[in-house]
Amino acid sequence: MKMTISQTKQPLASVEEHTRVTIKTLFQFLHAQGQGDYLGEQVTQLEHSLQCAYLATQSPKHGNDPEVILAALLHDVGRFIPAAEKMGKMITPDGKYIGRQSHEALGESYLRQIGFSEKVCTLVGAHVMAKRYLVATDQSYYDALSETSKRTLKFQVSHLSLLIFSIFKVY
């Protein structure tokens, strides 16, 4: 159960300071890790995150929802927080690094621990599953993915998952 500010019995200034520090820390992680290339793509991690947030604002259904936009911005937080170093790396047979295993679960857990809303946390945790679903049910979505994104699917999806999604689509 989420507590309201009055239930925390902390002075408002203390809550505001905690929020400021949390946001500053998150953006320091994003800025520090976001300058390098994003898995071999033509954009940095920071640019990718900002693009996703921008695209979320363009959604006819969710573009006015700040939690959706925030989740889009932070969807890859599990790639760049310090705890990500402990997560397994996804390496292609030819030796290319293409991301961290279970970064979505790590990101969801991290955001929940620092007090983000359930909606933001759930969306961050579900973004890889959403990609799997879209790939399984929409060929044009798959066709529009970059080669790097397609390679990450080999680590993120199984043929059984594709079969299950296909069955759900029928029903």
Task: Give the predicted meaning of each segment.
Residues Y54-Y171:
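Divalent metal-dependent catalytic cores for phosphoryl transfer on phosphate-bearing substrates
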Residues K2-I98:
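Acidic/His-rich, divalent-metal-binding segments that scaffold phosphate/diphosphate chemistry
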